[in-house]
Swiss-Prot record:
The active site is at T7. Protease subunit of a proteasome-like degradation complex believed to be a general protein degrading machinery. A double ring-shaped homohexamer of HslV is capped on each side by a ring-shaped HslU homohexamer. The assembly of the HslU/HslV complex is dependent on binding of ATP. Keywords: Allosteric enzyme, Cytoplasm, Hydrolase, Metal-binding, Protease, Sodium, Stress response, Threonine protease. The lineage of its organism: Bacteria, Pseudomonadati, Pseudomonadota, Betaproteobacteria, Burkholderiales. One of its GO terms (cellular component) is HslUV protease complex. It comes from Bordetella petrii (strain ATCC BAA-461 / DSM 12804 / CCUG 43448). GO terms for molecular function: metal ion binding; threonine-type endopeptidase activity. This is ATP-dependent protease subunit HslV. It catalyses: ATP-dependent cleavage of peptide bonds with broad specificity. SUPFAM superfamilies: N-terminal nucleophile aminohydrolases (Ntn hydrolases). It is an enzyme of class 3 (hydrolase). HAMAP family: HslV (MF_00248). Belongs to the peptidase T1B family. HslV subfamily. Its main location: cytoplasm.
C-alpha cells in the first residue's frame, strides 16, 4: 500500500497567523512514486487547514470523515476532532487506519493520531511524518530566535527536513490563515 508516513508535515502558529505545509514526495517502499502530491488541504469554507501523513487511502478516508464532522459541528474544530477520534478508536474498520492529521483553525492547532489522541501541541508548533522531528526542531529554533512569519518558518523548516530526510523532497505546499 502506498505510504505517506515517509513525508513531512509542519504547522507553525505565531500571533494571529498560522501556516501549514508539507512536501510532495510519495514513496512506495524505497521508490519515489510521485514528487508533487498535495498533502495539505483547506476545509470548511477555507477556515480550517489540514495536513496528513500515513497510508494514502487511510489519510484520504480520515480527511473525508473529518470534513463530515466539521460540517456536522458547523466548523467547530475541537468538537469535530474529538468526535472523529472517538469514532477512530471505537469503529473496527477505522481502528485499522494508519494515518495522522494536523488540523488548524484561527485559534487551535491539533494533532490527531491513530490511537485516538487529540493533542494540542506547545509553542504553536506541530510536525508529523518521517521528517517531522527535523522540521519541528528547525521550526522551534526559528520561532525562538527570529521574527519570521509562520509561512517563512514552515518553508525553511521543510527545506531543512528535505535536506536531511530522504523521504522528504523540496516540492512544498504551504497554506496560511490569519492576517
Amino acid at each position: 500500500m502506498e505510504q505517506f508516513h515517509a513525508t513531512t508535515i509542519v504547522c507553525v502558529r505565531r500571533g494571529n497567523k498560522v501556516a501549514l505545509g508539507g512536501d510532495g514526495q510519495v514513496t512506495l517502499g524505497n521508490i519515489v512514486i510521485k514528487g508533487t502530491a498535495r498533502k495539505i488541504r483547506r476545509l470548511y469554507h477555507d477556515k480550517i487547514l489540514a495536513g496528513f501523513a500515513g497510508a494514502t487511502a487511510d489519510a484520504f478516508t480520515l480527511q473525508e470523515r473529518f470534513e463530515a464532522k466539521l460540517e456536522k459541528h458547523q466548523g467547530h474544530l475541537m468538537r469535530a476532532a474529538v468526535e472523529l477520534t472517538r469514532d477512530w478508536r471505537t469503529d473496527r474498520v477505522l481502528r485499522r487506519l494508519e494515518a495522522m492529521l494536523i488540523v488548524a483553525d484561527a485559534e487551535h492547532t491539533l494533532v490527531l493520531t491513530g490511537n485516538g489522541d487529540v493533542l494540542e501541541p506547545e509553542h504553536g508548533l506541530a510536525a508529523i511524518g518521517s521528517g517531522g522531528a527535523y522540521a519541528q526542531s528547525a521550526a522551534l529554533a526559528l520561532l525562538r530566535n527570529t521574527e519570521l512569519s509562520p509561512q517563512d518558518i514552515v518553508k525553511q523548516s521543510l527545506e531543512i527536513a528535505g535536506d536531511i530526510c530522504i523521504y522528504t523532497n523540496q516540492n512544498h505546499v504551504i497554506e496560511t490563515l490569519g492576517e
